[in-house]
Amino acid sequence: PGVGQTGSLEDLNAEKSYGAMKVHMNTVAGNEMLVLESVKRYPNANFYGLNPGIIKTDIRSNFMGHNKALFGLIEGLIGLLTPSAEAYADKIVPLLVAPDLEGHSGVHFNKTGDAILPSPGLTDSHVKTFLAASERLIARIGVSVAH
């Protein structure tokens, strides 16, 4: 959240061509839009966006195919330069359970727990269009979304 990504509607499901970063940034934008829209759809619940940045995990293990050496090298560098998942959790979990957070649904937080602004291109119109396209994709497999 808050990194300026608005998502790419022309090939939302990467069926025409696949680009790892393009697909990843679509999910980043989509997650941010889910927070923004959920605040409006479900006013009795709280929603927050998290942008931890790059964290050392196994989530990228398929990104480099089966090249375990390259994966190990890259994850090792990431581990040296960025916080671990545990360090991020130590910082963010107390924030997410703080009583002062009540009433601030829709806020996005960066890797240090500071509030950040939503991406500027995520207008109400764009969010509705993107989420409608997402709902059409999942409807193809028989899943419907309640509004």
Question: Which stretches of residues belong to each language-model region?
Answer:
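C-terminal helical subdomain
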Residues: 30, 45, 49, 72-140
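Generic C-terminal helix-cap and adjacent flexible tail
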Residues: 139-147
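Alpha-helix termini
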Residues: 38-42, 98-102, 145
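Catalytic loop of short-chain dehydrogenase/reductase
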Residues: 1-44, 51-69, 74-77, 81
